[in-house]
Amino acid sequence: MAAISINVSTVKPLGDRVFVKVSASEEKTAGGILLPDTAKEKPQIGEIVTVGPGKRNDDGSRSEPEVKVGDKVLYSKYAGTDIKLGGEDYVLLSEKDILAVVD
């Protein structure tokens, strides 16, 4: 199977989905011990790269997304689909899986 090259800027989420660049996980503990990849926890914070057009309502109209590109968000630990593009980690989430916008 051939590898497909996808540019992050071409990803357009559908509906109420958002595409989030995952923040890097901690490399070492507070005590200075380096963590191997298998011991690192999955980050739950990231920056929104693209936002879908919004959820479609019963009457056919769309609800405006509550988040925007550039927002730093906290999301559910097991939410979304993990995607790796260009050596970077991303997650495709439904807007309902976002718990908070972080300042």
Swiss-Prot record:
Principal subcellular localization: cytoplasm
GO cellular component: cytoplasm
GO MF entry, a single one: metal ion binding
Location of this chain's protein in the cell: Cytoplasm
SUPFAM superfamilies documented for this protein: GroES-like
Top-level taxon of the source organism: Bacteria
Family: Belongs to the GroES chaperonin family.
PANTHER family from the UniProt entry: 10 KDA HEAT SHOCK PROTEIN (PTHR10772), CO-CHAPERONIN GROES (PTHR10772:SF58)
Self-association state and partner proteins as the record states: Heptamer of 7 subunits arranged in a ring. Interacts with the chaperonin GroEL.
Protein name: Co-chaperonin GroES
Native source species: Rippkaea orientalis (strain PCC 8801 / RF-1)
Gene of this entry: groES
